[in-house]
Amino acid sequence: AVKVVNEGLNSRWYAGSGIYRHVWLMKTDKVHLDEWDTFIDASKVEGKKATVDLHSILHNSGKEKVTAHLKIQIFSPQGEEVYSTTQPVNISGETNIPISLTFDIKKPELWSVDSPSLYTAHLSVKSKKLSDEITVPFGIRTVEFSAEKGFLLNGKPLKLKGGCLHHDNGLLGAVAINRAEERKVELMKANGFNAVRCSHNLPSEYFLQACDRLGLLVIDEVFDQWQQAKRPQDYHQFFDEWSEHDIATMVRRDRNHPSIIMWSIGNEIAERADEPTGEIIARKLIATIHKYDTSRATTAAVNSFWDRRDFSWEKDSERAFRNLDVSGYNYQWKEYEKDHARFPQRIMYGSESVPKEAAQNWNLIDKNSYLIGDFVWTALDYLGEAGLAHTLELAPGEHSPQFMGWPWYNAWCGDIDFCGDKKPQSYYRDILWKRRDISLAVQPPVAKGKREDINYWGWKNEFLSWNWKGYEGETMVVHVYSRSPKVRLYLNNRLLGEKEVNLDTYTASFEVPYEPGQLKAVNLKGKKETTSTELCTTGIPAMIRLTADHTKIKADKNDLSYVKVEILDKNEKLIPDCSVPLEIKSAGKGSVIAAGNGSADDMRSFRSLKPKTFRGKAIAIVQPNTEKGTITLTVSAEGLPEAAIVIETY
């Protein structure tokens, strides 16, 4: 039995409680292998040949000497054997034997974000019978960092289009169901990210496996504090006793993942520049990493010295960076050029940034090789730090808090919400990353006598909507995001105006009196109209649409189907301002384990089967039981026809 006593303030975000990740009890023969002892370094490639170093340990926990044969096989991404060797091993009782060998793979298929090719190593040990066998996936790729060339993956420059990510799974809480972990990676890839910073603790093994399979680069991060506390019951109370063991565990567990490019020793650490404590701890942690892996860079996320009043960035930050291979800057993008002048060999990246400064960040990163990328806080919404990204309308004399109280429950700073949908800042980021030619959003008027206050991590109160009943004739601010020199704006086919785009922010703003209909923004190339986007006023609710990300799932509780619920008008257009109470039912070989929406302050239970839509949408998460068959999900709302969808389990 496991008893959990999780009391006090042990984290700055929602950490979860109990056993929320897979726990495996491994029973082995006396002569056995261990996945975490096995390291396959496939980071050396020259021409059409990869040189692979394989290290492992053979254990004999018995008292008798054993003569065995160790067989090592390497299989290509297509499952073809490309290398094999068998060697005899004599191992005395109660001893361990290190195993090391080097071999070449000709014409290797390199792992990359666009082509994440994975090889497989199969190790087996046999005496009179098979004693043990393990399978270790790995990727062949090279990783290089320099101020002159930037970050190179397989010899090619690549800017890190990154997002920070906490470990929770939104409406599911902290539980790391395999499909939920995989979906996070899919959402990041689908929205232009090629890298993730695991903030600020180790991700699940399955999350890393998904990053390997789908091609998402990873900064693996281990600590949010060292000896000095951020919360009374946080990890600081265990740091001296456990930090070396825990960072070794991170590296031993994760070093075979080709997706991982950096090891991070901490986030916004209080002692980062303290003398001599900060440097002593940093060197110790880095030495432990290098004991188990020297093929990757070390890093940390370093913030300003708001907590050290006698320190300054110019005078003291060098001590926080001097032992690191790559320097992570939390919100300090204004220091990039000054620091490059002082330390021209320093390799930098934005380990945390905010959406409203994204253009300034990316403009610098795009043109400077010593800046290798940026990681927004955050890619996906997460539980805890409630309302960190709020935007409020305040009267004179009112002040905005850093966090929001009940009923706010999620941070609201993600580009992507709990339903997996893009928020306005994600469409803006698409312009920065050249994934979209033009985007359009609408900001309603602030109440008379008030002002809009955007918290530092927040975004202006804008919507991808032209549904503003009751605002007829009132002035809306329409933001057009584009890289074109000029854009035009039309309302119901009337040209409202033509404006130059501010190429520092990729924005042109128009003031438009509201009237229902079609709002259309168009890019101009010279005098020629090119790409366009539009927002249209929709009708009243007429139907419910259900869309499952997977309509066929395994009869296994580690699989899920995320079913999106949308309220449409008679023309099958999403109604973006629609809030409708729903009732969800399921029947068959599974059930709904969570339901809700993307709102940051809708505190009804995630287990409730009566969520409301938020901005026209909600989501139901369906989990199968262990039987093959079908699951039927039905959703109803007052005055609308019931909708149903069938999910097959196999």
Segments and roles (model prediction):
Residues V446-K448:
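Small/polar glycine-rich anion-binding or flexible loop at a beta-alpha turn
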Residues H55, R179-A190, N194-L432, A441-Q443, ...:
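Substrate-binding/catalytic cleft of secreted carbohydrate-active enzymes
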Residues A1-E205, A210, L214-V218, D246-T249, ...:
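Secreted/periplasmic carbohydrate-active enzymes, especially glycoside hydrolases
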